[in-house]
Amino acid sequence: MPKMTDAQKRDIILEMLHQRDAIKTDEQAVRKMIDERLEFVPNKKLYKFRRCSIKNFKTLEENCIWMPPANTFYDTFDCTINIDLQRNKRDIEVWLREKYPRLSYDLARGYCESHGVEMRQTFEDMVEYLQTCIDSNGDVIEEKEAAFLNRFVTAEERELLEQSLDSLIEIRAKFMEYEDAMIQVVHEAIEQMRTRMRDAMLVYCMAEHHDIGSLWENYADVYKGFCIEYSFSDYAEKPFEDYKNLVYLLPITYRARLPYFDMVPFFEGVIRQGIAQDTSWQRDPGLNADLNMQLYYKKKEYAFEREWRFGINNKGNCKQYFPFVSALYAGKDMKPGNLRRLCSIARKLRVPVYKQVPNRDNNGFDYEIIREENV
């Protein structure tokens, strides 16, 4: 079974972003994407481990799942953005040095246009002006400025040019003065986005296998709970509303060191929005893909989970119909009353129940089907 690479995952996310509206209603497009996704799911089955509780039994009996908000996860770094402010500060300084003049020019031109002033100079003219007419303290070298102006305009036109140049100098000085403060503003914006992402997402996590001891111990009450098997082999035979959320299903990538989110595009976008009210960066597919990729990384110590997950917007709709249950597995130490309840639910759902028992060599588990007469 091939593993989905990060490059493949990013391409999938980009496709979903490009087809954001289509995947809400286009059944053919959604089925195509789900089919491609399931090629990476072993046997097209995934598993969920649960404790025995009234809520969990009721949700299962109704053929539903409970999708908790990401902000309830024990791992505070899950479903969030991993940044390195100090490392990105160097990258941002490079950006300021290499791309700042273009941003300054664009902002100055926008400022002039909004004030009815024609900006006749090209970007190259502005670069030359900044390099030759402004000293290291940001002050104008008047004699060089005069020489520069005389090359472009008549005396009558000079006042208009000075207005455009003054606006450029004003913006440039402001940026230079508050450079560190802007980096902090971006950092705070990312922190707000981290919180918003965890608050705004409902997430359902599943595993590739049912025989994972750590999951039985951590999520199934140390073998006293149960495991739900979901099969997606015949998902397309069900109504579109029942399977449409599977389009968001993706695997987790486990890393010893979590990849950092590159703040530079975010930094530029926040600055453009703050100064020029340009919000186009928020719709940039590449930036949004990189943000979404951050939701599918976890530390390597969680690799035993072999997790897949999908998320939807948090609209208070934690309970979702999910009619894909194909089998149930009872933990070896499940109490008799809970076992009877699980078997009753299995009859209603028309799926088999297996009981976890030590194997003959006593070094693992077998899963034996439970007959009704034995319950």
Predicted features along the sequence, with ranges:
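Partner-binding and oligomerization surfaces adjacent to conserved cores of proteins
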Residues: 2-375
